[in-house]
Each structure stands twice: as structure tokens, then as C-alpha cells.
Regions:
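Activation segment
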Residues: 27, 52-54, 91, 103
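Low-complexity, flexible helical/coil segments
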Residues: 44-46, 55-61, 83, 114-119
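Acetyl-CoA-dependent GNAT
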Residues: 1-47, 51, 64-66, 70, ...
Length: 124
């Protein structure tokens, strides 16, 4: 169990788990490589997943937006996340939500390039 971490889930009308995401209100608990765990005044999101059945329904967007709102509620100035080239659908979603590439957050893990993104929240 991590301090100020939450697992948010999406449940369909017929009570099926169709998506989930992990929100971190304390970047020290974010658990990634690179400098992300040292970032101040930020929330993090990880491990967005949506079932094949629910893809294209806005489930992933709703889960990410819920995390963004949690970050706003904490008064954080930005939200941090990581993804890889293999996650092109998620990458596109993050960009549509306003996340921008943040090369200072990039790192390599076991030979895999991991790309950092940041969403600046502005006035909360």
C-alpha cells in the first residue's frame, strides 16, 4: 500500500470491470525510473487499462480526467505520466487531453525507452 495512491476503476452497466488507472498524489510513491519520483507539486498516473469491449467508449478518457481532477483538488500544478511506443492508443489519448512530451522525464528501463509526459494544470 502506498501513501496517497488510489486505484480508480470503471464498471459497465452490467457490472463488468472495463477499465482502471492508478493515481499517485505523492510522486515519491510513483515508482518509476528517471527523475519522476523527485518532481514536486505534481500528481502521477500509471497503468491505464481499458478492456477490448470498452475501447472507443471514452472509458480511458474518463479515468484519466478523474485523475486530473484529483490533482486539481490537491492544488498540484501538473500531472506526470509515462508511456512507450507500444502504447500508441494511450499516447494519442494523453495528447488529446493536453499532455505534452517532457523529455526530462524520459528514461530507459531494461532496454526499453520510456517517454515522460506532463500536463500543466495552470490556475486551479
Amino acid at each position: 500500500e502506498k501513501k496517497d495512491a488510489r486505484v480508480l476503476v470503471a464498471i459497465s452497466a452490467d457490472d463488468e470491470l472495463v477499465g482502471g488507472i492508478v493515481y499517485f498524489g505523492d510522486m515519491a510513491e510513483y515508482g518509476s525510473g528517471g527523475i519522476a519520483t523527485t518532481v514536486k507539486n505534481a500528481s502521477g498516473i500509471r497503468l491505464l487499462g481499458v478492456s477490448a469491449r470498452a475501447r472507443g467508449t471514452g472509458t480511458g478518457k474518463a479515468l484519466a480526467r478523474a485523475c486530473i481532477q484529483l490533482a486539481r483538488d490537491k492544488g498540484h500544478s501538473h500531472v506526470v505520466l509515462h508511456t512507450t511506443h507500444a502504447m500508441q492508443v494511450a499516447w494519442s489519448l494523453y495528447e488529446k487531453l493536453g499532455f505534452e512530451r517532457s523529455k526530462d522525464l524520459d528514461f530507459v528501463q531494461e532496454g526499453l525507452q520510456v517517454f515522460g509526459f506532463r500536463l500543466w494544470l495552470g490556475e486551479t
